[in-house]
Amino acid sequence: MFYSRLLEIAEKEYFNNFVRQAPKNHILQTWEWGDLKGKGAWVPYRMVLENEEKQPVAALSLLARRIPVLGKLIFYAPRGPVGDLHNQELMDFLFSEVRKLAREKDAIFLKIDPDVSIEDLALREYLRSRGFVAAGRKEGFEGLQPKFVFRLDLTPDLDTLLANFHAKTRYNLRLAERKGVEIKENCGKEDLPIFYEILQETTERDKFLVRSYHYFEEMWDCLVPAGYLKLFLAYYQGKPIAGTLAYLFGDTAWYIYGASANAHRNVMPNYLLQWTMIKWAKENNCKTYDFRGVSGNLAEDNPLYGLYRFKKGFNGTFTEFSGEYDLVFSPFYYGLWTNLEPLYQKNIRRLINFKKAIKGEKRRD
């Protein structure tokens, strides 16, 4: 028999300690990540399932957000649940408790995107049998979390890891070292504006969107004190030319954001940054280094193929996740949401592109 509870702040460490050691743990299921999202439009709820001995057996950090116009809530559990996902009795109880919360809060559906490979047919069949609807079957970055990533097994020693890199990757890494690129690892919050300036330069060059600087400040304040976030900066001839942000939780490190200036890209700072982060992950007893998202379209004429080739060079395993699944509580409102949400996102993108175009015109003036 299982029991569920919604936790308050006093039990933050209890929650995190379970998530850290549990199967399918993930930084996006930590208390601090919920706090970060809670600074925006989301409201976090932390649910724990306990057995008769009052020991935790499963957990779920659930984010709730109110939909404009409809006035209803949606639930999202990023990379959740945490626990034995193949224990059907446990999962059945967990989702039944989420249903109760949904009735209380007037939620339309729960979205999950568990840290599970698409090859896990048993879990996919279980979710379908319990009424989950597959959603977000895309090849790019359209989902809430990347569907395709590279993951590097860190259990070999560093010499073996380096030897397994593609020859061109090793060459570029050593080129950066020969050219005198230096990596600053002991970065403080005062270095964050430096990184963000380079990130803005990257977004303008590569034409993708980025969050506001305020969001990065909030991310720093929520995650750095817990030891979950680290900034790396690459310097060449005394000037910052590239940077990365990485997460670390449990036995996994994630490469989250990368940025490079237009100048001096030929000294290959990004390769040395990745190698530095891999060594940092090893020093912190990580077993996995996650390079995060790549496109699922592996055609060489795909504009995102260069990102795939860069990450592939470190000899990680190309991984496709099972994807997003929705557990629908209100079919009528869910139907409205699935039809209106793409239109909403399309108009948001148009507005952003318009603002960028205006910004570009002002610069040319």
What residue spans do the PLM features occupy?
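A conserved beta-strand-loop-helix scaffold within acyl/acetyltransferase catalytic domains
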Residues: 2-53, 57-70, 114-119, 130-266
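Active-site/acyl-donor-binding loops of N-acyltransferases
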Residues: 8, 22, 36, 63-64, ...
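Glycine-/proline-rich flexible loop or hinge segments
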Residues: 73-85, 106-112
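A short, internal acetyl-CoA/4′-phosphopantetheine-binding micro-motif in the GNAT/acyltransferase core
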Residues: 78-87, 155-156, 258-267, 295
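Non-catalytic accessory segments adjacent to catalytic cores
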Residues: 88-146
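Aromatic (often tryptophan-rich) hydrophobic motifs at membrane interfaces
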Residues: 92-103, 218-335
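A structural signal for short, well-ordered beta-strand segments and their strand-loop junctions
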Residues: 108-113, 184-186, 288-290, 320
